[in-house]
């Protein structure tokens, strides 16, 4: 039976950064143990960000990235550097192949750890490989934010009965569950909880058949209101999106961002950001359900812009609020960096589940991990 690989969004990201012809691709190939990236003496050989999953001793799988070089003067140089900047957003460790470390780089990516390399490489290749891998492993093991984060925090303990409400509508992927549901179920099983998974239509019947009320209910944010109305007030309620907001980002800032919803003008400009790219359906939460709820509460003059994947604008000054998805397909540093960019530009940011709970007036009812 083929094992399922750990999602790339759960792995540490190590990025190689530096000027053109500084040896980035050479170091990349050295670390992956094969000629994976094209190398040449011609400046600007690397034209796109290149990723490769590798296994490090004592650390496990990580994602290593090679990037287009700084100082690319070709006609596409600016676009290549834009791709590099996007990649830097998700980096946990940045191997810098420069004579000196640019202070602005550190300021722009405060959540990353920078490891400068002296140029040119003087060590024997195998020795350099071993030293670099040892340095990366040591850095990751000592990194506070690299600790084993949990989705649930203290919301569930061994023996708890946890009810998962998971609508399988047109927006649900065919033949499988979405990643937050899978990760939540796995963590609950690891905690030795008893897990019951249902669709919203079966909630009432399920509650009536249980001998006791569940210790926790986790729902899809799109049916928050429907579930909340049927639950006794003493039963703790949260959503997969809320869990992801704490797992991937700074939940306290995301909750504070949602409070702004009650203060927005009717013609406010809101950015809705989705981490992954998928074809939306008429039941899509980001493209249909959330905008509909926003306009119901704030009015039809509301201006909503949607972005997907890496198309997150560097200039957020034209928006009064950013509403981000749960970021299940992004690593933690990527979402934290987006939060930092929004904070720097004084633009509040929240996420789908928290925003929906706020708009429905039940945010105080929702438990946070």
Q: Where are these predicted regions, by residue range?
A:
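Flexible nucleotide-interacting loop at or near the entrance of a catalytic core
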Residues: 1-6, 128-152, 173
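P-loop NTP-binding site
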Residues: 156-369
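Charged, alpha-helix-enriched surfaces in structured cytosolic catalytic cores
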Residues: 22, 26, 41, 45, ...
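Conserved GTPase G-domain signal focused on the G5
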Residues: 23-24, 120-144, 246-248, 361-362
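Conserved G1/Walker A P-loop phosphate-binding module
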Residues: 1-78, 82, 86-89
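Short, flexible loop segments at the rims of nucleotide/cofactor-binding pockets, characterized by
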Residues: 41, 70-76, 100, 140-142, ...
């Amino acid at each position: 039976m083929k094992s399922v690989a750990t999602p790339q969004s759960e792995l540490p990201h190590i990025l190689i950064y530096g000027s053109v012809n500084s040896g980035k691709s050479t170091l990349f190939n050295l670390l992956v143990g094969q000629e994976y990236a094209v190398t040449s003496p011609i400046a600007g050989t690397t034209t796109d960000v290149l990723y490769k999953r590798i296994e490090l001793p004592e650390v496990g799988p990580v994602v290593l990235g090679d990037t287009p070089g700084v100082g690319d003067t070709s006609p596409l140089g600016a676009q290549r550097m834009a791709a590099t900047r996007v990649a830097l957003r998700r980096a946990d460790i940045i191997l810098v192949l420069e004579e000196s470390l640019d202070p602005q780089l550190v300021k722009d990516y405060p959540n990353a750890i920078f490891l400068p390399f002296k140029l040119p490489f003087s060590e024997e290749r195998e020795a350099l490989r071993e030293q670099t891998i040892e340095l990366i492993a040591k850095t990751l093991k000592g990194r506070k934010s690299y600790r084993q984060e949990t989705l649930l925090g203290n919301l569930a303990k061994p023996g708890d009965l946890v009810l998962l409400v998971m609508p399988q509508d047109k927006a649900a992927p065919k033949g499988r569950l979405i990643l937050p549901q899978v990760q939540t179920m796995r963590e609950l099983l690891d905690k030795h909880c008893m897990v019951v998974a249902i669709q919203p239509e079966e909630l009432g019947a399920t509650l009536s058949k249980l001998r006791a009320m569940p210790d926790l209910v986790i729902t899809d944010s799109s049916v928050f209101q429907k579930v909340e109305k049927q639950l006794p007030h003493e039963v703790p309620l949260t959503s997969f999106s809320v869990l992801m907001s704490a797992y991937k980002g700074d939940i306290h800032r995301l909750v504070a961002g949602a409070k702004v919803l009650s203060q927005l003008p009717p013609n406010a400009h809101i950015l809705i950001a989705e981490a992954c790219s998928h074809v939306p359906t008429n039941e899509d939460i980001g493209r249909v359900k959330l905008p509909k709820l926003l306009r119901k509460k704030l009015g039809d003059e509301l201006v909503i812009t949607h972005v997907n994947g890496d198309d997150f604008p560097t200039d957020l000054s034209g928006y009064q609020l950013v509403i981000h998805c749960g970021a299940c397909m992004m690593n933690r540093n990527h979402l934290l960096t987006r939060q930092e960019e929004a904070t720097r530009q004084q633009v509040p940011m929240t996420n789908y589940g928290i925003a929906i709970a706020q708009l429905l007036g039940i945010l105080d009812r929702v438990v946070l991990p």
